[in-house]
């Protein structure tokens, strides 16, 4: 695919006090982020959850970390275990954690953890 902005440097686009878009911020980390997605989805594949009303969600999703968002006939929950495997969600990949921290610092939140 042709990237018309391949030569553009990352930049920040302030939206409002305390909110900014970090354009192209994650591009240099793309390979590590995709590896992290592969690691998560190997253990907890993408799936279409069903709402309490019985409708299948159009978005396929998975989770990682201590809690994951899930839905079932009883409602919406944050769950420690994957409802399909009853195993804990995969740990959040280090590349995700590093990106979150570095983006928060770049956006003006130096104490983010």
Regions found by a protein language model. Give the residues of each.
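Non-heme Fe(II) oxygenase metal-center motifs and adjacent flexible, charged/small-residue loops
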Residues: 1-113
């Amino acid at each position: 695919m042709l990237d018309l902005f391949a030569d553009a440097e990352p930049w920040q686009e302030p939206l409002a006090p305390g909110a900014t878009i970090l354009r192209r911020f994650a591009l240099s980390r793309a390979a590590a982020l995709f590896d992290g997605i592969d690691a998560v989805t190997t253990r907890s594949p993408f799936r279409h959850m069903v709402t309490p009303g019985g409708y299948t969600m159009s978005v396929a999703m998975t989770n990682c970390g201590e809690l994951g968002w899930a839905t079932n006939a009883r409602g919406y929950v944050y769950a420690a275990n994957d409802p399909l495997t009853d195993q804990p969600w995969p740990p959040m990949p280090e590349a995700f954690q590093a990106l979150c921290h570095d983006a928060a610092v770049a956006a003006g939140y130096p104490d983010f953890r």
